[in-house]
Design a protein with these regions (language model features):
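Active-site activation/catalytic loop segments of kinase-like enzymes and analogous catalytic loops
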Residues: 47-57, 118-155, 168-188, 200-207
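ATP/Mg2+ or Mg2+-diphosphate-binding catalytic cores
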Residues: 179-236
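Glycan-recognition and catalytic cores of secretory/periplasmic carbohydrate-active enzymes
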Residues: 34, 39-43, 95, 100, ...
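Hydrophobic packing residues in well-ordered alpha-helices of helical domains and bundles
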Residues: 10, 14-17, 42, 67-70, ...
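Secondary-structure capping and boundary motifs in well-ordered enzyme cores
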Residues: 13, 85, 90, 114-115, ...
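Active-site acidic catalytic loop and adjacent metal/ATP-binding pocket
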Residues: 24, 75-122, 129-136
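All-alpha amphipathic helical-bundle segments outside canonical DNA-binding/catalytic cores
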Residues: 34-40, 158-170, 195
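ATP-binding pocket architecture of kinase catalytic cores
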Residues: 1-39, 44, 55-61, 82
Length: 236
């Protein structure tokens, strides 16, 4: 999928990806099959970030007060996610996990599927680490999705609220990925993904700046950019 994307073809492929995602989101919320994206998972994701990214990878180069600010902001994000409409989530619905064949979209790596917030897979798809699109183009995809779920999921969500859902999910996702990839590096000495860390941090900073209650994230993470770059330079 990722090898087919270009400015000329992006609308076509993202439309297919949206259609396939809505099929997944249309599935029955069967708790006998799918676990829930709940408080326990959110707390676990935070613990990965704090232990492996802050304490170990960055060698705890952050004041306790700054860490507390991040935790309080993370809790606000968590409340937002728990309050969102619930659907079946792939959990990592990014272009690298999509394939294209016979004018159809196929999905890989779906073993972590669960019942979770509607913005979760949209954040994976549109806040991709490897593809960057103009805001105007992304907005047209949001509007495309918004119209389709009103018809296919009988769910009416304003574009402002939909963007908020996606943004909050994307920040939480980046907390999780920073923690998870830091653990992978520390446990297995795999360095191939640490170059993604500045991209993740920049996503968190730029996205949180748009929301008054999340601005402390941006203000707290900005000074860490230099610390992170120095740490990566030492490893490489």
């Amino acid at each position: 999928y990722q090898f087919n994307l270009s400015n000329e073809k992006a609308d076509f492929y993202y439309d297919l990806a949206i259609n396939e995602l809505i099929k997944i989101q249309s599935l029955k919320l069967d708790k006998n099959i799918f676990s829930y994206f709940d408080d326990n998972l959110l707390l676990y994701n935070w613990s990965l970030f704090e232990k492996f990214f802050i304490n170990n990878f960055l060698e705890n180069k952050i004041h306790n007060q700054s860490l507390e600010i991040l935790k309080e902001s993370y809790e606000k994000i968590s409340l937002n996610l728990l309050d969102q409409p619930k659907v079946i989530c792939h959990f990592d619905y990014e272009c690298r996990n999509l394939i294209f064949k016979d004018n159809k979209t196929g999905v890989l790596d779906f073993q972590d599927a669960l019942i979770g917030p509607i913005g979760l897979d949209l954040a994976s798809l549109f806040k991709d680490l490897y593809f960057f699109w103009p805001k105007e183009k992304i907005l047209t995809w949001y509007e495309n999705y918004q119209k389709k779920i009103e018809k296919k999921l009988n769910l009416k969500v304003s574009i402002t609220k939909l963007i908020e859902y996606i943004d909050y999910c994307s920040i939480q996702r980046q907390f999780r990925i920073l923690g998870k990839l830091s653990k992978v590096y520390l446990d297995l000495n795999r360095t191939n993904r640490i170059t993604d860390f500045p991209v993740l941090l920049n996503y968190m900073i730029s996205t949180s700046e748009a929301y008054e209650e999340l601005k402390p994230i941006s203000e707290t993470l900005l000074p860490l950019k230099e610390v992170l770059n120095e740490r990566i330079a030492k490893i490489n």
